[in-house]
């Protein structure tokens, strides 16, 4: 990287040449050194399966419980049944949408899902798959501020609406969506509500009881 500072017409100008800037940290970012130091023992020394009966697993099990309790407290979960641990957000989103499809659509009388045009690809791709299976999907557009109005969700709900899926924080713009208001609308209309809150965790207060 080459930084050039020059003075012209009593103004200083800063020039940067051959500089690479990584702008995808919301998707994947480097591990914080403090996190690396905290996890290193479990990569090299305490690597036993925490659910195993042997002593190597018994040594790691308390640490797993400690981490889970930290997670429960961080989102104000009432008990461990409020959380289902999955491998990643992709698995979680697929699990929810396809689970609703099987339970309420294939085995019920509801055939409609509402989502937005700016969801993460794990949502939009799954919705496209469900459309191929005959599910009706409504994609709501965003307003001038890059988010959606809760009223647009209310207006899109039909008698056969099974699920509303709206992200909390957009992974590209960082815009927050009014999920509390949307959730109340869904509750009032007896519609399931799902939010991909992946980008909100660690950035805003998350309270699953709120």
Annotate the PLM regions.
Residues 4-210:
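Pyridoxal 5′-phosphate
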């Amino acid at each position: 990287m080459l930084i050039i500072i020059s003075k012209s017409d009593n103004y200083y100008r800063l020039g940067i040449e051959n500089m690479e800037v990584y702008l995808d940290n919301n998707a994947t970012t480097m591990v914080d050194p403090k996190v690396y130091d905290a996890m290193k023992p479990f990569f090299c020394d305490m690597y036993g399966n925490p659910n195993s009966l042997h002593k190597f697993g018994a040594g790691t099990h308390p640490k797993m419980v400690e981490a889970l309790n930290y997670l429960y407290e961080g989102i104000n979960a009432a008990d461990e049944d409020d959380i289902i641990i999955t491998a990643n957000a992709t698995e979680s989103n697929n699990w929810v949408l396809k689970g609703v499809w099987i339970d309420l659509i294939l085995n019920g009388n509801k055939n409609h899902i509402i989502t937005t045009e700016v969801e993460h690809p794990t949502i939009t791709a799954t919705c496209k798959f469900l459309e191929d299976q005959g599910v009706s999907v409504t994609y709501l557009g965003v307003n001038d501020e890059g988010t959606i109005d809760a009223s647009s969700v209310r207006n899109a709900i039909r008698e056969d609406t099974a699920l509303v899926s709206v992200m909390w924080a957009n992974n590209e713009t960082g815009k927050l969506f009014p999920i509390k208001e949307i959730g109340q609308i869904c509750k009032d209309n007896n519609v399931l509500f799902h939010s991909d809150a992946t980008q909100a965790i660690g950035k805003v207060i998350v309270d699953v009881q709120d």
